From Swiss-Prot:
This is Probable multidrug resistance protein NorM. It comes from Buchnera aphidicola subsp. Baizongia pistaciae (strain Bp). The lineage of its organism: Bacteria, Pseudomonadati, Pseudomonadota, Gammaproteobacteria, Enterobacterales. It is a multi-pass membrane protein. It comes from the Bacteria. GO terms for cellular component: plasma membrane. GO terms for molecular function: antiporter activity; xenobiotic transmembrane transporter activity. It is found in: Cell membrane. Keywords: Antiport, Cell membrane, Ion transport, Membrane, Transmembrane, Transmembrane helix, Transport. The chain crosses the membrane at residues 44-66, 92-109, 130-147, 162-179, 186-208, 247-269, 282-304, 319-341, 391-413, 423-445.
Length: 451
C-alpha cells in the first residue's frame, strides 16, 4: 500500500500542472466565445461554422504529434538522452508537413462548407474569410504541441502550465483589442478572432522556446564528431514515419470522437429549442470534466513510458493500479457532486423549467458514466505508453460508432425499441459506448500485463 501511495503522489505531481495547462488552453475558446457573443449575428454564425471545420482537422494534427510523449519518456527512461534531439527535430519536420496539409485543406474550406450544408451566402463568405486567416495559426499551434510533448515526456510539465496561463491572459488582451467595438481603430469582428489566434499561438510557441532555452535536459546537444550540424537538422524519414505510424491511430481516435459529437449535435439541431439548449449545457459540463481524466492519462503515460524505457517492469503494475485508483476516487467525487448539486450547476446556465428538467436527466447520465469515462481515458494513456495505439483506434471506433451511436440513434429518433426519446436518447448511447470502451480497454491492459 505504501508504494501505491508514493506513486499516487508522483502521478498527482505531474497531473496538476498538465491539468492547469489544458484548462488554460480550453479557457481561451470559452473566452473567445463570450467575446464574439457581442458581435453581429452573421459574425457569430460565421465563426461557429469556421470552428466546426477547424476543430476536427486541427485535433487530428494534434493527435498525430501525441506519439512524441511516450517516445521521449521511453528514451529518457532508457538513459539514452542523446537520442532525444533527433526525435524532436523530426517531430518539427512532421509538424511542418502536417501544417502544410491542414493549411491546404482549410484554404479549400468552401468545398467542405458546400458539401456538408447549405449556409447563407453572406455567412459562408464570412466563414471562408475567417478560416483562411485562422489557418496561418496552424504551424504555431503544432510547433507548440511539439515542445509541450517534449517537456511532458521529460517529466517537465511546468513550462507548458506557465505558458498556458500567460497565453490565456495574453489572449484576453489581444482578442478584446481586435474584436471589441470599443477599439474603433480595430473592431475586426470575426476577422479579428482569426488574427488573435495567429498572434496567440505563435506567441505561446516562441515564449515556450524562450523559457526552456536554459534547461540542459530539454535542450540537450548531441556531441558527435561524425554528424555535422546540417545533418542534425535534416529530416530523417524513418523517424518521421515511426512518429506518424504511432500517432495516426491516436489522431483517428480523436477524429472519430469529435465527429461523433458533431453529428449528434447536428441531428439534435432539428429538435425543439429546449432540447438543443439542454444538450449544449450538458455537453459543455461533460467536456470540462473530460480534461481531468485526460491529464491523469497523460501523467500515467509519461510515468509508464519512463519505466518501460528503463526496463523496470516491477513498477508497471503499481503505476497502472495507482492511476486507476486516482481515477476511481476523482470520478466518484465528481459523480456525487453532480447528483447533489445538479440544480445549482444548471441554473448557472438557464432558469427555464423545461431546459432544467431535461438537462437534469442528461447530467444524471453524465454522473453515471464518469467512472467508465475515467477508466477508458486513463486506459488510453496506458496503452499509448505501450505504443499499442492501433488497438485504441479499433476500440474507439467500435464502441462509439458501432455500439453507442446506433443505440443512441434508435432511442432518440425511432420507435423500434421504445417511443422516440429525443435528445436524451443520444446520451444513453454515449453511456453504452463508454461502458463498452472501458471494458475493452481494461481487458487489453490485462492482456498486455500478462505478456
Amino acid at each position: 500500500m505504501k508504494k501505491h501511495l508514493h506513486e499516487i503522489k508522483m502521478l498527482l505531481k505531474i497531473t496538476i500542472p498538465i491539468f492547469l495547462a489544458q484548462i488554460s488552453q480550453t479557457s481561451m475558446s470559452l473566452i473567445n466565445s463570450i467575446m464574439i457573443g457581442h458581435l453581429k449575428e452573421n459574425n457569430i454564425a460565421a465563426i461557429s461554422v469556421g470552428i466546426s471545420i477547424w476543430s476536427p482537422i486541427i485535433l487530428f494534427g494534434h493527435g498525430l504529434l501525441l506519439s512524441l510523449v511516450p517516445t521521449v519518456s521511453r528514451i529518457h527512461g532508457s538513459g539514452k538522452i542523446n537520442k532525444i534531439p533527433e526525435q524532436i527535430n523530426n517531430a518539427y519536420w512532421l509538424a511542418t508537413l502536417i501544417s502544410l496539409v491542414i493549411m491546404i485543406v482549410l484554404w479549400n474550406s468552401d468545398v467542405i462548407i458546400h458539401t456538408i450544408s447549405q449556409v447563407n451566402p453572406i455567412i459562408e463568405q464570412e466563414s471562408i474569410k475567417y478560416i483562411r486567416i485562422l489557418l496561418w495559426s496552424t504551424p504555431g499551434y503544432l510547433y507548440f504541441q511539439v515542445i509541450q510533448n517534449q517537456c511532458e515526456g521529460l517529466l517537465k510539465p511546468k513550462p507548458a502550465m506557465v505558458i498556458g496561463l500567460i497565453g490565456l491572459l495574453f489572449n484576453i488582451v489581444v482578442s478584446y483589442t481586435l474584436i471589441s467595438e470599443k477599439f474603433h481603430c480595430f473592431n475586426y469582428g470575426s476577422t479579428g478572432c482569426g488574427i488573435s489566434a495567429i498572434i496567440v499561438y505563435w506567441f505561446m510557441f516562441i515564449a515556450m522556446k524562450k523559457i526552456t532555452k536554459n534547461d540542459i535536459l530539454i535542450n540537450y546537444n548531441i556531441k558527435n564528431k561524425n554528424i555535422s550540424n546540417l545533418e542534425m537538422y535534416l529530416p530523417n524519414y524513418k523517424i518521421i514515419w515511426n512518429l506518424f505510424k504511432m500517432g495516426f491511430p491516436i489522431a483517428l481516435s480523436l477524429f472519430c470522437e469529435i465527429t461523433l459529437f458533431t453529428l449528434i449535435t447536428l441531428l439534435i439541431a432539428s429538435m425543439e429549442t429546449f432540447q438543443i439548449i439542454a444538450h449544449q449545457i450538458a455537453l459543455n459540463i461533460s467536456s470540462t470534466i473530460f480534461i481531468l481524466p485526460l491529464s491523469i492519462a497523460t501523467a500515467a503515460s509519461i510515468r509508464l513510458g519512463f519505466y518501460l524505457g528503463k526496463k523496470s517492469f516491477s513498477k508497471i503494475s503499481t503505476i497502472i493500479l495507482s492511476s486507476q485508483i486516482i481515477g476511481l476516487i476523482i470520478s466518484t467525487t465528481i459523480s456525487t457532486f453532480i447528483i447533489l448539486f445538479h440544480y445549482q450547476i444548471i441554473t448557472l446556465y438557464t432558469k427555464n423549467a423545461n431546459i432544467i428538467k431535461l438537462t437534469k436527466q442528461m447530467l444524471f447520465i453524465t454522473a453515471s458514466y464518469q467512472i467508465f469515462d475515467f477508466f477508458q481515458i486513463i486506459g488510453n494513456g496506458i496503452l499509448r505508453s505501450y505504443k499499442d495505439t492501433n488497438i485504441i483506434f479499433i476500440i474507439t471506433c467500435t464502441s462509439y460508432w458501432i455500439v453507442g451511436f446506433p443505440f443512441g440513434y434508435f432511442l432518440a429518433l425511432t420507435n423500434y425499441i421504445v417511443p422516440h426519446m429525443g435528445a436524451i436518447g443520444f446520451w444513453y448511447g454515449i453511456l453504452i459506448a463508454l461502458i463498452t470502451s472501458s471494458i475493452m480497454i481494461l481487458f487489453r491492459i490485462y492482456i498486455l500485463q500478462k505478456k
